[in-house]
């Protein structure tokens, strides 16, 4: 911009000098015209006074010729000066037009720079929001990982208790089978004792008491089996709930990973837009 202004000042100075030269040429032209007119008057007077003096006539004719040449030269200088002034005017006009275009480009560049700065500010705010959300998501993921570990621990504990209950149930089933075998044996003995009832009444009473005792044990075993069955069902219910909790937590983690991936893509797109804006600013 300073170079263009300096160039315009030089062109204006050249224009003023050309105008001064044109005015000087015009003055010389007028002076020559006046001198020519004066010489013509003097020539007429001399012709009237010195009709016979050819040398003087030639002398004044030569002076007149010189004056005419000077007049023609002055006309030529004036014409050249006018052409130069017109050329300078055209150059000044072109420079002014170029200056206007440069100012328009500068205004456009400044506007783009301002827009790029605004975009950069918005991108920075967006990045801060994304970073905050990502930090919150990471904290949430850490909490959910802790919950997942707790759920897995609960599930493992439920499995362990289930295995323990199953093991106890196997033991109880073995005891029950043995009790049934003993009961069958007792029934067989009872049948034998019934045949000998008449002869061994005391033994029959003893056997009846023993059979009642076995019956009470059977009821007790059945009650224990029922309690163990209820506990087994409760353990299975807790295991199913733990599995559902694990599934929900895994789904929440997958959703958070998808959201985090989407935020990373959005952050990458914003970074690329910012790079393009900075590249545009650099190219300008």
UniProtKB/Swiss-Prot annotation:
Sequence segments annotated as region (Disordered): 1-38
Where is it located?
Cytoplasm, Cytoskeleton
Principal localization reads cytoplasm
PROSITE patterns according to UniProt: TROPOMYOSIN
Q: Where does the source fall among the domains of life?
A: Eukaryota
Q: Name one GO biological process term.
A: actin filament organization
Q: Which residues carry this modification: N-acetylmethionine?
A: 1
Pfam family of this protein, just one? Tropomyosin
Alphabetized UniProt keyword annotations: Acetylation, Actin-binding, Coiled coil, Cytoplasm, Cytoskeleton, Muscle protein
Q: Which residues form a coiled coil?
A: 1-284
Q: Where is the composition biased (Basic and acidic residues)?
A: 12-38
Report the GO terms under cellular component. Answer: actin cytoskeleton; actin filament; cytoplasm; plasma membrane
Q: Which GO terms describe its molecular function?
A: actin filament binding; cytoskeletal protein binding; identical protein binding; protein heterodimerization activity; protein homodimerization activity
Question: Which protein family is it in?
Answer: Belongs to the tropomyosin family.
What the protein does comes down to: Binds to actin filaments in muscle and non-muscle cells. Plays a central role, in association with the troponin complex, in the calcium dependent regulation of vertebrate striated muscle contraction. Smooth muscle contraction is regulated by interaction with caldesmon. In non-muscle cells is implicated in stabilizing cytoskeleton actin filaments.
Q: How does it assemble?
A: Homodimer. Heterodimer of an alpha (TPM1, TPM3 or TPM4) and a beta (TPM2) chain. Interacts with HRG (via the HRR domain); the interaction contributes to the antiangiogenic properties of the histidine/proline-rich region (HRR) of HRG.
Give the comment on domains: The molecule is in a coiled coil structure that is formed by 2 polypeptide chains. The sequence exhibits a prominent seven-residues periodicity.
Please report the name of this protein according to its UniProt entry.
Answer: Tropomyosin alpha-1 chain
Q: Which organism is it from?
A: Gallus gallus
The gene that this protein is the product of is TPM1
């Amino acid at each position: 911009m300073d170079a263009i202004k300096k160039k315009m000042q030089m062109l204006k100075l050249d224009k003023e000098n050309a105008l001064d030269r044109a005015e000087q040429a015009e003055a010389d032209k007028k002076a020559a015209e006046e001198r020519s007119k004066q010489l013509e008057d003097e020539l007429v007077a001399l012709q009237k006074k010195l009709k016979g003096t050819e040398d003087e006539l030639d002398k004044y004719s030569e002076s007149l010729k010189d004056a005419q040449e000077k007049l023609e030269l002055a006309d030529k200088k004036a014409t050249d000066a006018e052409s130069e002034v017109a050329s300078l005017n055209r150059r000044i006009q072109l420079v002014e037009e170029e200056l206007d275009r440069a100012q328009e480009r500068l205004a456009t560049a400044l506007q783009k720079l301002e827009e790029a700065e605004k975009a950069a500010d918005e991108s920075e705010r967006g990045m801060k929001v994304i970073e905050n959300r990502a930090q919150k998501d990471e904290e949430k993921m850490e909490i959910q990982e802790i919950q997942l570990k707790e759920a897995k621990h609960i599930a493992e504990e439920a499995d362990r208790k289930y295995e323990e209950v199953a093991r106890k149930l196997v033991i109880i089933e073995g005891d029950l089978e043995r009790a049934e075998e003993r009961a069958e044996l007792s029934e067989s003995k009872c049948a034998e004792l019934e045949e000998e009832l008449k002869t061994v009444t005391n033994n029959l009473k003893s056997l009846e008491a023993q059979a009642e005792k076995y019956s009470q044990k059977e009821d007790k075993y059945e009650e224990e089996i029922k309690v163990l069955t209820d506990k087994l069902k409760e353990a299975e219910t807790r295991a199913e709930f733990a599995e559902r909790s694990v599934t929900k937590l895994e789904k929440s983690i997958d959703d958070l990973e998808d959201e985090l991936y989407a935020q990373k893509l959005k952050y990458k797109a914003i970074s690329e837009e910012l790079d393009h804006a900075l590249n545009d600013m650099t190219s300008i």
